[in-house]
Structures are given as C-alpha cells and as structure tokens.
Amino acid sequence: MVARYVVSPRGGRRAHRTIASALGEAARRGRPAVIEIEPGGYPEALTVRSEVRLVAVGGPGSVVVEQPRGAVLDSCAPAVVEGLVLVGRHADVVGCHAGALTLERSEIRAYDGVAVHARPGTSVTLRDSTVLHGRFLLAGAHGRVERCRFTDAADNALAVIDGGHLEVLGSRIEGSRIHGVFVGGGRARVEGCTLTRTGMAAVFAGARSELVVADCLVESVEAEGIGFVEQSRGSVDRTRVVDARCGIAVASGADPVVRDCVLTGCRDTGLDVNGGGRGRFRDIEVSGAGNVAVLVTRGGAPEVDGCRVTGGTAGFAVTDGGRGRFTRIEVRDLTSAALRVHDEATAVFEHVRVERCPSGLETKGNGGTRAEIGDAVLCDVEMAAVTALGQSWVTLRRVAVERAALAFGAGEEAQLLLEDCRAAGVGVGGASAFGTARVVARGLTVSGSDGLGVFARDTARLEVVGAVLADCAVGGATFADRSVGRLADCSVTGEGQLGVLHNGLVDLGGLRTTLPVVEKEVRTEPGPTVVHHHYEGPVFNGPVRDVQLAWNNIHAVQNRTTNEDGTRT
C-alpha cells in the first residue's frame, strides 16, 4: 500500500512544513509513498532514500525548491518528480546516485552548475520539462528526454559520456554556448528535435561514439550543424540544416551514414569530409553554400550516391589528398566550378549533370591528381566544361557537353583521355591541347562549333581516333606551333572554312573530308618575357617615355591629362 504525505508551508493537521521532513518519514517507514506539495517556496535540499513520488498539487510551477548553493535534489532510490521548479547554484541541481529518476512537467534552473547529473548505472527520464542554463549529464547512465526545452546552457545542453545511452525525442535545444548534444564514448539518439543558436556543433559525436539523428531541424549555429569525429559511427536521416557554418562535418576516421538530408544556406560548406573521415551519403540536397557545397580534403574518403547542388559558389571540391566516389550528381546555377579536383586528390564522378555554371570540371596538381567522369551531361557552361592543368590526369567516358565556350581542354603537363564523348554548340572548340599536355580522344563527336572541332598548340600532343567533326565554322582541326598528333579514321564534314590546318607533324591516316587540308606553320607563341629588376629605384637601359612609376609607397594615385595639342601630362 502506498503511503500519502502532505506538505504545506503553512503547516496544518497531519501536514509537514518541509519536503525534507516528509521524505525523512517516508524513508523511515520504508514503503512507497506519494508526497503532495502545496504551492509555495521551499528553501531546502532534498534527499530521496526510498521509493517516492513528489507532486505539486497546484500544477506545474506552483512549487519552487531553491538553494543558494549546493544540490537541490539527490535521488538514491526510485523517484518521480512532477510539477516542481528546482533552482540551484554552483553544484549539481539534481543528482541521481542510484535507481531511476523521472521528472515530469518540471523546471530546472542551474546557475553555474549541472542541471541533472546521472551517475553510472542509473536511469533518468525527463518529460515535458524545461532546463535553463545547466546541462543534462549522463556519465555511464541511461537517459530519456521527451518533449523538453533546453535554453541557454553555459556549455553543452545534453552530454552523454563513459558508455552512457541517451534518447532525445521531440525536444527543443537553443542557445547552448558549446554543443546542443555531445556524445563522448557513449550512444545517443536524437529524433524529431529542433536545435538552434549553439556556439559550436549543434550535435556532436566524439571519440568512438555512436550517434543517430533523425527528422531534426538544425538552424542558426555558429559551427557545424552535425559533426562526427574520432572513429565515431551512426546515421543522420531526414534532417535539415539551415544557416550553419558547415552542414555536416566528418573527420578523423568517423564513418556515418547520411540519408535524405537538406543543407541550406551554409556559410562555408554543406558537407565537409576531412582528416581521414569517411561516410556514406545518399540523396543529399545542398543549396546556397557560401564556399563549397561538398568539400573532401586531407585524406577524406566519402561515398556519395545522389546529391543535388543548387546555388552558391563551388559544387564539389576534392583537394589535398582527398578521394571519393560520387554518383547521381546534379549541379546547377553556381558562381564557380561545378567539380574541382586539386593537389593529389582522386575522384570518380558517375551519372552527372551540370547546368548553368562558369565551368564544369577543373583539375590541377601533380601526377597523383586524378579525376574520372562517366555518363555525364554538362550544358550551358560559360567557360570550359572540362579543364585539366598541372600534371593531373583526367578520364572522361560518355560525357556530353552542350553549349559551352570550350568542351574539353588540357594544358601545362596534364593528360586528358576521352572515350565516346561529344560536344555540341561550343564556341571555341570541342577538344584542345596546349602547353605540353596530351589529349587522346576516341569516338569523339563535335558538331555545331562556332570555332574549331579540335586544336592543339605549343608543343602539346593531340591524338584523335574515330572522330566525327561536323559543321565547325572555322575548321575541323588545327595543329599550330610545334604541336604533334594524329587524326586517325576521322571525318570532317559541313561547310567550314577548312578541313584540317596542320604543321606537318601530324599523322592524317584515314582522314575523310571534302574540305581543304592545308599544311602551314602557324605560330601562336608569345614573345620573349621581359624582366625588369627594380632595386632602390627604376633602372633604365634604353629610351623610355609615356611611363608612370611609383616605388616605396603604400598607396599611389595616378592621374593622366590629355592637352589641347595632344600631349599628355
């Protein structure tokens, strides 16, 4: 049978004046008890030593238990607290030392301390409650939070460490100075929650943790929306991140699964995988990223299957030794490159569509920089659809370019391999090699070029096999300077000015065309570079006129006036 006790600040027949008095009597009897507390303020510390239920009979907020310093409630036995306001300073306001503790429709105000601290082996449930300023800490304990509000925590709003397990459902977390939810060596599930205005990552999985996030909204955070580091695992499903510095970040060996998420208005990056981070990302949407929608760097190695990027600066950037595989990619309406692979990075892109971007794929770096694209369409590109520079290697298979300045180009010492690719409606040409680059194209089709079909200059090498070059306004192919190569089994058709213009260093075996084929040396190389050495002032070794010079200045203003006689001053 459950014993019943009444507490009233005014006292009364069979009523206790303090809650501690009622708790003491319940502990002495050793029976389950219900303690009904009348409205009022109770400046005392409570210790639960037997199974008990504390109820504010006047409803939530009618009973305020406050201590100027130290703990307010220490629970050492199964307990339920309903409707109380617990206010403490400089200590754990609520501590669960043994058994299970449930707080319902309650409010906890923690000034310079922990709001709720669950010790190893205990269990705490927080339901329909509010926590101000302090944090909910599980150290080797189990916790469940339902429909609660956490506001202005001085550090982490909720933290689970040392093998603890936390479930947070349908709650709101706002204004935390550090993280909204922190997991360090434990497990956490965050579902149906809103997290906003956190000073660091809203949800963060630390070393060897497991984090599951589903159906959440993360907005207006100073750092990452969701972060996984140090070999942590877990998943993120159907979650939206808005106005974070980075939407989702993965680093240092972490390997989450992310599905059906939307990352909007991220100030730096949408997805950031770096420092050996991995991860599998499926059906992700990134819009309006301030710097890069998807960034992979410093050994990051994600797998992305289904990603739509719209608006913002750059699309996918794989740099500094990063690597990744990207499938079912859509990139639209950017102000910079759709795909970028630099500095010993490797990337494979399959089933790609790029629309209305300044450039498609850009690669640059040493010989360890490699990119592959298969089954792609790049259209309405302002500059080059594909550009390979440095010593990078690029392989394109079944890539179609529609309406671009240049379809495929390689310069410096880069290598570009084309298989069954096509270009239509280009301005300058279909494929280009310059510098000392090498371009090999098999099964290439170029149609409707306002310039050339293919061309090479400098000392580059251009090899074209089985190509169809149709309706190119200037000509099918041009080899200028000391460039070399071959046109094998190729056809040049249409009403262009020339079929082929070459320098005599090209193998034309199997060329089919009715247009003129002209051998002529064409030079495009610039003149010698002139180097001026300025020491304390300019040194003139010949006549100089019409020149303005300034040195040893931080700021200079130049004005030029044309006189009536045509002279300038």
Model-identified regions with their sequence ranges:
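Short glycine/acidic-rich loop motifs that flank beta-strands on beta-rich extracellular proteins
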Residues: 42-46, 67-71, 89-94, 112-118, ...
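Long, low-complexity intrinsically disordered regions enriched in small/polar
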Residues: 497-569
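Right-handed parallel beta-helix
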Residues: 58, 78-87, 100-110, 123-134, ...
